[in-house]
Amino acid sequence: VQQHEFTAEASPSTLAGSFTPDLVSSKTWLCNYLKKELDGRSAGDIYILGSWYGNMGVFLQQANIDFDRLIMVETRPRLLTTARRLLEPLYREGRLKLVLGRAEQIVYPNRPITVINTSANDMSRVWFQRVPRGTLTVIQSRDAVKDVKVITDTAAQFYAKFPLENTVYWGQRRLRDPETRYTRYMKIGYK
């Protein structure tokens, strides 16, 4: 499935920047296909790796995706503080857990969970190796980036670098930022 949609990208590292049209489009795309795969089932605990400001939680709720808890994994404490404020009702209900640390160090429970990583370029693939076999996993990456840990300049590179036992969706979406056009890739399946 290929989607060719152009959206301007101007995403500063701020809470407002995390809601720019390109990022909203990417997260909405993710939620639409995740919801389709879940088909009314609960996602269990959802681990959001590199959670940034935590707004993935907003999109998951807007899409009415059923989950037990959101576990936000982030290396910057101030971003987790913002995520807590943004998702305060979930926090008060005990459905939001904030983890200060690296995705590559997470120890996952021995039960059904969902793992989402929309920053796969920015982490070594150790995070992926640690995800338990059979886990519902959602990965987004992009081409045309420099100084990243994982280069995915083609759809084939992206697909090969994150092998899933059962891929239920994979596609790409064209975006545009001030300097260049680029492609965001997404893969959903069971590791």
Kindly give the residue locations of the regions a language model identified:
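S-adenosyl-L-methionine
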Residues: 1-41, 75-112
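C-terminal substrate-binding/active-site "lid" region of AdoMet-derived donor-dependent transferases
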Residues: 123-190
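Conserved class I S-adenosyl-L-methionine
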Residues: 41-54
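Conserved SAM-binding motif I beta-strand of class I
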Residues: 68-74
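Short SAM/SAH-binding signature in class I
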Residues: 110-120
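Short acidic, S/G/P-rich loop/turn micro-motifs used as interaction or catalytic elements
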Residues: 53-56, 76-78, 103-106, 119-124, ...
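Conserved SAM-binding loop of SAM-dependent methyltransferases across substrates and taxa
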Residues: 53-66
